[in-house]
Amino acid sequence: YFERSHENTFFSIESNAYKHLTRQNSEQWEYLYPQINYDINNIKDHDFGGNVSLFNDFQNYKNLDNSYSSLASSQINWSKTNVSKNTGLIFDNRANFRIVSSSIDFKGTEKDENTIAFYPQIASKLSFPLIKINKENSQTLTPVLMPILAPYNNYTGPQAVNTGNIFSYNRATGLNNWESGPRINYGFEWFLDIKDNLDI
């Protein structure tokens, strides 16, 4: 494993091998060689006043069935936060676009698979922090509304909603998945700061 970061760039490369001890009389070794990541963050957008970031990933595997799979992903993100001085509303605006190319090579057969997928999305998180402060603590109650516009795709199933991801822009994990379809997330965030350095 090797990684290096400099200012707003990050690069890493790694290779791994896994032995599956529970498999008998068949291939036990699975390989990742290599996985490469190259990211660029905090690129100033002088036209619209936002920030741009780029994330690039490449993965190459040898699987237990002796097939070879590869995945290349490139994603561009744009973000800009606006605060209304008149109303106090906070607008966290984001746009994302990811392109993924994946392939599976079944050696000695004609069943090879090749897929190219596009995942565009536009979203905004509207919030209105309400703050109450007294001698013992400070409390913040924030109503949140998140309209998200994304096309439906055939690669990602329905995503479970829980307290950890209710305000997530994309609940799907993995480079070849993206939460599908237009949606609206809404709810409240509550934060309690007690003067004895206890936060809830």
Can you describe what each PLM-predicted range is?
Residues 1-200:
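Outer-membrane beta-barrel proteins and related beta-barrel translocases across Gram-negative bacteria
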